[in-house]
Amino acid sequence: MNISFSKSAIDDLKSIKEHYLAQGLPQIGQDFIVAIIEHIETLAAHPSIGRVVPEFNDDSIRELIHSPFRVVYLRESESINIIRV
């Protein structure tokens, strides 16, 4: 299954990295980004692993929790679109 990232999701990942860089913790920021992306990659084999986002109550809009972050994605028949992090 193909996984794509919206511009908003890419911007979110950049913001996470910049936040930790500004705190003087660039390696922690980089480690978080790598771990989040690895978690997202599990969706290719298990697209329904995330729970339905309560605010939307739509089975196709799901979330993975990667504490303290939430990855919101759209599950479609042939692809997954990462909406926000």
Stretch-by-stretch model annotation:
Residues 66-70, 74-85:
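Enriched for short, Lys/Arg-rich terminal
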